[in-house]
Amino acid sequence: MKSLIQPLMRAAGVCVITDGAAGNERQALALAQAMRLTPTVQRVALRAPWRWIGPAQTRGVRFAMPRAQWRALSRPWPALAIGCGRHAAVVTRALRELSKGATYAVQILDPRIDPAHFDLVIAPRHDGLAAPNVIQTMGSLHPIDDARLAAARAAFPLFAKLEQPRTVLLVGGPRRGLELDTAWMTRLIETIDRWHERDGGSVLISTSRRTPAEWRERLRGAFRHGCTCFWGGDADGANPYAGYLAYADRIIVTPDSVNMLSEACAT
């Protein structure tokens, strides 16, 4: 039976649905890739009122997005729809209902409605979501494995020449429910600077879209003993994130990103 699943899904179609947020899309694609499926990706920007109501109401959902996008999602119904995030949950629930079960709907992250509206819900354990069709994970889904780390080492060979220990700092930023201020960042910089002075080695820093501009500028020239590599965006060249993970001796992650924490643990 298992040998039939992949051919059937390839024939009938697999789609990944997100709001376009990188963290959400990365999780949904990681699941599809782990199943050795090649999905189409639909990034939905829901119109009002669906973007306010969320998955609690799916009536008229075809009007929540451009007509061409709804047609791409529903003609034919995909065999498998993988959604991640609240806006995606509107669509994955609707596909399951309107297709009369022809679409197997998988929702990643707590949809904040009864999980019974989906075939499968995958949510981190800290969300506290429990139901017969819920799989709890320790962190977030991600694509990091030995093969990807080996590929990253091959793609960033210069990192192998950096002095050890290689300390990687992955920086996000403040978000709702988590206060990270300038004083907190100052303490973090001072701690890493003391480690660097004591142990030597290299410091490699990466920031994200959520990182305040003030933090980014401070981090760029923060360490008395020098920062070996700093990446703050496309202006700094190719994103070295995968290479950082592959070569790190120790990784420090700001606590705002479950995705980055999970991927760091996978190394």
Outline where the language-model segments fall.
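Active-site and donor-binding regions of nucleotide-sugar-utilizing enzymes
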Residues: V16-I17, A21-Q136, H142
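Alpha-helix C-terminal capping/helix-to-coil transition sites in glycosyltransferase folds
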Residues: P76-W77, H117, G243-Y247, A266
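Donor nucleotide-activated moiety binding/catalytic core segment of transferases
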Residues: R220-M260
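Catalytic binding pocket for nucleotide-activated donors in carbohydrate/polymer assembly enzymes
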Residues: N259-T267
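Conserved catalytic-core segment of nucleotide-activated headgroup transferases in glycan assembly
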Residues: P165, P174-T207
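Short, structured helix-loop element that forms part of the nucleotide-activated donor/catalytic region
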Residues: R210-F223
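A nucleotide-sugar donor-handling region in carbohydrate enzymes
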Residues: P115-D181
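Extreme N-terminal starter segment of soluble prokaryotic enzymes
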Residues: M9-C15
